[in-house]
């Protein structure tokens, strides 16, 4: 399994960064990178289509090393499984980051729609429901 290098950058779009800031402001997530990782995991779990997600117009958020090790491993494993399922080859760290980024960028709009008009506490409760439902798979 290919790994993401710890010094590689996580690079969301400005639109994604805006929603990440909103989630942090609502105290849903303490760190932007955690919200971005959750969006990626959500999209992976939902089997979202990432074929139209562009990797252009990105801005540095933080390095991969700031992710908790367990989260990093889960994202890498998810990327490996989904790449294999879709006939893609992960050849190096950047290819793993690219697929994780695409899933995060696909997941954020879906979460934004799902959480529209909800308070931070309501969003946190929904996150618990998502995690509980995912654990039953």
Feature roles, as predicted:
Residues 23:
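Recognition helix of helix-turn-helix/homeodomain-like DNA-binding domains
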Residues 30-40:
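Short amphipathic alpha-helical segments
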Residues 43-49:
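Short, basic alpha-helical nucleic acid-contact segments in DNA-binding proteins
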Residues 1-11, 15-19, 37, 49-137:
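Charged, low-complexity intrinsically disordered terminal regions and linker tails
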